[in-house]
UniProtKB/Swiss-Prot annotation:
One of its GO terms (biological process) is malate transmembrane transport. NCBIfam families: dass (TIGR00785). GO terms for molecular function: L-glutamate transmembrane transporter activity; malate transmembrane transporter activity; oxaloacetate transmembrane transporter activity. Residues 35-58 are annotated as: Disordered. Expressed in leaves. GO terms for cellular component: chloroplast envelope; chloroplast inner membrane. PANTHER family: DICARBOXYLATE TRANSPORTER 2.1, CHLOROPLASTIC. The chain crosses the membrane at residues 94-114, 127-147, 166-186, 235-255, 262-282, 307-327, 356-376, 380-400, 415-435, 451-471, 484-504, 538-558. Belongs to the SLC13A/DASS transporter (TC 2.A.47) family. DIT1 subfamily. Its main location: plastid. This is Dicarboxylate transporter 2, chloroplastic.
Length: 564
């Protein structure tokens, strides 16, 4: 789940006594003959995983090693150091009072202060009030998202707005379970080290210059994206550790002026590229699957969705991925242009990692099986969720994952809880006529302006995109607004498939607007390499550039494909 409210952020804590001790190697003529420490990710069931530099050498050690520690989420990135053993102050339990009052007030005001339209039933109006309070809670976060969603579905049952089976009907939804299983695949990539190995190979092949290094990281993310549906997992589990290790080895440290040598550019480029990687594949982000499910409930059905999604996204996403590192190289340039040591560092890291393990090969084979079934499964009667279930079963049977790994993947179970609540409410809003009534009102307003469907399409897409400044979750945005905006598009005469795909692609692209707009945003900003004003400035500039690329290139490509 790409939600800021539930994410820890990464900050640097060092125990070094000299700047040399923070590098992968000491600057000596014989440094390549020593084992270099490399990054490893340690995950546990505790809420505070740690990232550490470790050395696989049994005969050499560093007297002081850089230590990366996950800290609780802050509003700002800090460069100050603190002991890794310092315990955070105890957090206050229970709901936050002011966000709670505001969230509940939204629904109460609609229910009791706003006259019910004659076209709607009391049940529909009451469900809309509960839904709006639920959505307000997603934005204001009086409680964690899953807890607040549970309160929302409880309210719908207690008030007899929905019967229990109807309120919980979405918990059997195939798409939601596909999302849950995809989180387990992501854990497999991290646990086996396969994702880290893939990214390191691209650093070795393309890392002689800063620009080449950026392209290597961008390409590697695009390759692992279809099997890792969480941009947060990709950012925190694979790419941020690699970027930080490369930056530190080049003397680019977070917090100070040296960060501009390499770290700021790599962080910003990876951050801005991630949205296009997520938009490229249906299974590259959890919200993609939710978008298509909500579209289907409004009558927009796409045959062979995995293939069709990839075909439609391929050209605009490829152009955007190709241009993003180059554009940022001009607009947000690194001080260090050449990184001749990066391939050597990557080669040494691969040497320390050793040969590909059995579990990595199993992971490769399993993902090839799953992706093949996602592409061709419909022809042999295997649905996407069944393909994912088969893949997870293989990983469990062969010991790549154990059941505790699945149980400890809290984001998966949390996603199941609140996705199901939102999908269930959204489907009932459609069944009770709320969505059609709302979209009809907007469509009539647009028609009074004598707008053609392309003009209405542009206005609605822009509104859907930039309203994300009010959200801290991509999936929360989808659950709150996707159905309504899709219905408005359709009512305005926009072809259904075009509107559904464009809204879904935009959902990935606006994840880089701010430091709170997505899970990966919090991870990358929390690393301490970019200033907050730069995040907002470059976020807006790249949003306009991406919108232009997807509108021009995508518009022509979709016309060729016959989507409209």
């Amino acid at each position: 789940m790409e939600s800021l409210a539930l994410l820890p952020t990464l900050s640097l804590s060092t125990t070094t006594t000299t700047s040399k001790a923070t590098a992968f190697l000491r600057s000596s003529t014989t440094s390549l003959h020593h084992r270099r420490p490399h990054l490893s990710l340690s995950l546990s069931s505790t809420p505070k995983p740690t990232l550490t530099f470790s050395s696989h050498s049994h005969s050499h050690s560093l007297s002081s090693k850089p230590l990366l520690a996950l800290k609780p989420l802050n509003a700002t990135a800090s460069s100050s150091s603190s002991p890794a053993t310092t315990s955070p102050p105890p957090t206050k339990s229970g709901a936050k009072l002011i966000p709670l009052i505001l969230s509940v007030s939204v629904g109460l005001l609609l229910r009791f202060a706003v006259p019910k339209p004659a076209e709607l039933t009391p049940q529909a109006w009451q469900l809309l009030a509960i839904f709006l309070s639920t959505v307000a809670g997603l934005v204001l976060s009086p409680l964690p998202v899953g807890a607040w969603a549970f309160l929302g579905v409880t309210a719908s049952v207690v008030t007899k707005t929905l019967p229990f089976p109807t309120a919980f009907c979405a918990f059997t939804n195939e798409v939601i379970w596909l999302i849950v299983i995809s989180f387990f695949f992501a854990r497999g990539f991290v646990k086996t080290g396969l994702g880290d190995r893939i990214a390191t190979y691209f650093v070795k092949w393309l890392g002689k210059s800063t620009l080449g290094l950026s392209y290597g990281l961008t390409i590697s993310e695009a390759l692992v994206a279809p099997a890792m549906p969480s941009t947060t997992a990709r950012a925190g589990g694979i790419f941020l550790p690699i970027i930080k290790s490369l930056s530190i080895s080049s003397g680019s440290l977070p917090g100070g002026e040296s960060r501009k040598k390499l770290g700021t550019y790599l962080i910003m480029t990876q951050f801005q590229s991630a949205g296009n990687s997520s938009a490229l594949f249906l299974t590259a982000a959890a919200q993609n699957l939710l978008c298509l499910k909500l579209a289907e409930e409004l009558g927009v059905k796409i045959a062979s969705p995995w293939v069709f999604w990839l075909k439609a996204a391929s050209l605009p996403a490829f152009v955007a991925l190709l241009l993003t590192p180059l554009i940022l190289y001009k607009l947000y340039p690194p001080e260090l242009k050449d990184t001749p040591e990066a391939p050597a560092l990557a080669a040494e890291k691969l040497k320390n990692m050793g040969p590909v393990t059995k579990n990595e090969w199993v992971m490769v084979g399993t993902m090839l099986l799953a992706v093949s079934l996602w592409v061709f499964g419909e022809k042999i009667g295997v649905s996407s969720v069944v393909a994912a279930m088969l893949g997870l079963s293989v990983l469990l049977l062969l010991g790549v994952l154990d059941w505790n790994d699945c149980l400890n993947e809290k984001s998966a179970w949390d996603t199941l809880a609140w996705f199901a609540v939102l999908v269930g409410m959204a489907s009932q809003l459609t069944n009770l006529g709320i969505v059609s009534w709302m979209s009809g009102c907007v469509a009539r307003s647009l028609k009074t302006m004598n707008l053609s469907w392309p003009a209405a399409f542009g206005i609605l897409q822009a509104a859907y995109f930039f309203v994300h400044y009010l959200f801290a979750s991509q999936t929360g945005h989808v659950g709150a607004l996707y159905s309504a905006f899709l219905a408005m598009n359709i009512a305005s005469g926009v072809p259904g498939v075009l509107a559904a795909l464009a809204l879904a692609y935009n959902t990935n692209l606006f994840g880089a607007l701010t430091h709170y707009s997505s899970g990966q945003a919090a991870v990358y900003y929390g690393a301490g390499y970019v200033d907050l004003p730069d995040v907002f400035k470059m976020g807006f500039i790249m949003a306009v550039i991406n919108a232009t690329i997807w509108t021009v290139v995508g518009g022509v490509w979709w016309k060729i494909l016959g989507i409209y």
